């Protein structure tokens, strides 16, 4: 389970993992108030990518990452619906 030290590396690897098989990929976001740790985990059951942070500024990056993944999911689904109706 590779744990990334920089957000840029993690986000690239996570997006690549999602695009490889969107139906199997899932994202878990966990916050521990006692430690002040925020952990983002992206997995497809074969590969598990982890990024941990204590920085408040990383929350904005994580929010942007989630919206980017949501856009990819919606774009993928809309293409599939269009293909099924034709």
UniProtKB/Swiss-Prot annotation:
Q: Name one GO biological process term.
A: SRP-dependent cotranslational protein targeting to membrane
Tell me where in or outside the cell this protein is found: Cytoplasm
Gene Ontology CC terms: signal recognition particle, endoplasmic reticulum targeting
Ribonucleoprotein recorded as keyword: yes
Recorded hits in InterPro entries, A to Z, give:
Signal_recog_particle_SRP9/14, SRP9, SRP9-like, SRP9_dom
Q: GO terms for molecular function, please? A: 7S RNA binding
> Which terms are listed as keywords in the entry?
Acetylation, Cytoplasm, Ribonucleoprotein, RNA-binding, Signal recognition particle
Keyword Acetylation in annotation: yes
Question: Which positions bear N6-acetyllysine?
Answer: 52
Q: Which domain of life is it from?
A: Eukaryota
Record note on quaternary structure: Heterodimer with SRP14; binds RNA as heterodimer. Component of a signal recognition particle complex that consists of a 7SL RNA molecule of 300 nucleotides and six protein subunits: SRP72, SRP68, SRP54, SRP19, SRP14 and SRP9.
Question: Would you identify the family this protein belongs to, as annotated?
Answer: Belongs to the SRP9 family.
Cited function: Component of the signal recognition particle (SRP) complex, a ribonucleoprotein complex that mediates the cotranslational targeting of secretory and membrane proteins to the endoplasmic reticulum (ER). SRP9 together with SRP14 and the Alu portion of the SRP RNA, constitutes the elongation arrest domain of SRP. The complex of SRP9 and SRP14 is required for SRP RNA binding.
**UniProt name for this protein:** Signal recognition particle 9 kDa protein
Gene name tied to this protein: SRP9
